[in-house]
Swiss-Prot record:
Protein name, as recorded: Porin B
Induction line: By glucose.
One Pfam family in the UniProt entry: OprB
Domain of life of the native organism: Bacteria
InterPro entries assigned to the protein according to its UniProt record, in alphabetical order: Carb-sel_porin_OprB (IPR007049), OprB_Porin (IPR052932), OprB_sf (IPR038673)
Main location: membrane
Naturally occurring in which organism (per UniProt): Pseudomonas aeruginosa (strain ATCC 15692 / DSM 22644 / CIP 104116 / JCM 14847 / LMG 12228 / 1C / PRS 101 / PAO1)
Gene3D superfamilies: Carbohydrate-selective porin OprB
Functional description taken from the UniProt entry: Substrate-selective channel for a variety of different sugars. Could potentially facilitate the diffusion of diverse compounds, dependent on the presence of a hydroxyl group, but is presumably restricted to carbohydrates. Involved in the transport of glucose, mannitol, fructose and glycerol (sugars able to support the growth of P.aeruginosa). Facilitates glucose diffusion across the outer membrane.
Upper lineage: Bacteria, Pseudomonadati, Pseudomonadota, Gammaproteobacteria, Pseudomonadales
GO BP field: carbohydrate transport; monoatomic ion transport
Similarity section: Belongs to the OprB family.
Membrane-related topology note: Multi-pass membrane protein
Length: 454
């Protein structure tokens, strides 16, 4: 525990969303189509209109994700409180073969809006170092409106070649991973989480081209080119379309294997990839003259590029009494980053998910994940040098730079499939050495993640 001099009262209540869950639970007793538990949408089929639109090629969606978190013990500031953050996503997917007769062509448009505050910033991490992960993954990239997807995709040669162009993020296609957990270390593209200055995950978009080729059964290779433009991250540039501010390009390549295992054809997915950024990047230790920047105070040395690689593995390994829609799946992630320029130089993650654990709850799921995030040794070396130059060795001194090493995150959740349009996932998270700082107490956090489709 390292308390700030001033603490704030508990954050905004989340009772309205618990009421939403209660509405979903109680709706089964009513015949109202708008809240039918078996409907794909909370607001129903609009008298059959939505199904009619789907058949014509129009798929309109309004989705919501809300995440609450409360610190139960530990962290930098153990004054108990809660934080809530959320996201709305409004979009349309169009089958242009049905609409315009353009063979094997699709269009996607999505705007997002994020709100709220993050417990990691307010309680878990030392403000001088931060929490490397986040206990609320949906927070971040500016609490604002953004154009998140605006792309056209077309397939050729009976679907073997897939080309997508427009505005979208790298994690939509490369280093992709589900986002059922609430902790950031188990959600989405992990490259973007630890190399976020160049790899922009949802909800940020940039001009991009992705080409994917199915060269053998279950095997794919894809390459991409993404605009490297830091101005896209700015809160006021959520709908920026121009290329002003572009610094270079991010070039990822990835090999994908999607096997079906055993007599029950249990699905798996394995990804091996590499990225290269042509944009300049600051060295984490050296200055412009090749001397320790923490000693000289000069500008950091500018490197001409940045790179890294990743591995993602997901595999269902059992079914449940012969039902392949239920059963145990294993997952793992590994990312390795440029030691000259990246604060995090490597990350590992392991976990399990069991779908349909109980016959009475066949659509529920249970997940457990553990992650390790390692801070570049040169970052720690510079922090120690800065403290020596300043003559500071007292952690409580505001000018002290905390020494960062390794942060560990773990999460256990139970996903309640309330209806076909509402899932609620209460969870417990444990963070060891928040920010990789040994002086910060390990933190225990309770959370709840709500996902719904209107």
């Amino acid at each position: 525990m390292y308390k700030n001099k001033k603490t704030r009262p508990a954050a905004r209540t989340v009772g309205c969303l618990f009421a939403l869950g209660a509405l979903g639970l109680g709706s089964a007793a009513h015949a109202a189509e708008a809240f039918s538990p078996n409907s794909k949408w909370m607001l129903g089929d609009w008298g059959g209109k939505r199904t009619e639109l789907l058949e014509k090629g129009y798929d309109f969606k309004l989705e919501y994700v809300g995440e609450a978190a409360a610190n139960l013990d530990g962290g930098y500031d153990d004054d108990k409180t809660g934080r809530y953050t959320d996201q709305f996503a409004l979009g349309v997917h169009m089958d242009l073969e049905k609409i315009l007769g353009w063979k094997a062509t699709e269009f996607q448009f999505t705007v997002t809006e994020r709100n709220g505050k993050n417990l990691s910033n307010d309680r878990i991490g030392d403000p001088r170092a931060g929490h490397i992960s986040s206990v609320q993954e949906v927070w971040g990239r500016g609490q604002t409106w953004r154009l998140t997807q605006l792309w056209l995709k077309q397939q050729y040669f009976d679907g073997a070649l897939d080309v997508k162009f427009g505005r979208f993020g790298e994690g939509e296609d490369f280093n992709s991973f589900p986002c059922d957990f609430q902790n950031l270390a188990f959600c989405g593209s992990q490259v973007g989480n630890w190399a976020g200055s160049i790899w922009y995950n949802w909800p940020v978009s940039q001009w991009a081209l992705r080409v994917k080729y199915n060269f053998a059964p279950d095997w794919y290779v894809q390459v991409g080119a993404y605009e490297q433009n830091p101005s896209n991250l700015e809160t006021g540039n959520g709908f920026k379309m121009s290329g002003s501010g572009t610094k270079g390009a991010l070039l990822p390549v990835e090999l994908i294997w999607q096997p079906k295992v055993g007599a029950e054809q249990l699905p798996g997915e394995y990804r091996l990839g590499y990225y290269y950024s042509t944009a300049k990047a600051d060295d984490v230790y050296d200055d412009v003259d090749g001397q320790p920047q923490g000693l000289t105070g000069n500008d950091f040395k500018s490197r001409g590029s940045k790179h890294g690689w990743w591995v993602v593995a997901q595999q269902q390994v059992t079914s449940h009494n012969g039902d392949a829609s239920r059963g145990l799946s294993l997952f793992a992630n590994l990312t390795v980053h440029d030691k000259a320029t990246n604060v995090v130089d490597n990350y590992q993650q392991l976990g399990v998910v069991y779908k349909g654990p109980f016959d009475a709850r066949p659509k529920d799921d249970i997940g457990l994940g553990i992650a390790r995030i390692h801070v570049n040794d040169d970052v720690k070396k510079r922090q120690r040098l800065v403290n020596q130059v300043n003559g500071i060795d007292d952690y409580d001194n505001p000018l002290y730079q905390p020494l960062q090493d390794t942060e560990y995150n773990a999460e256990l959740y139970y996903g309640v499939h309330v209806t076909d349009w509402l899932t609620v996932r209460p969870n417990l998270q444990y963070i060891k050495q928040p920010g990789g700082v040994d002086e910060v107490d390990n933190a225990l956090v309770a959370g709840i993640k709500i996902q719904t489709v209107f």
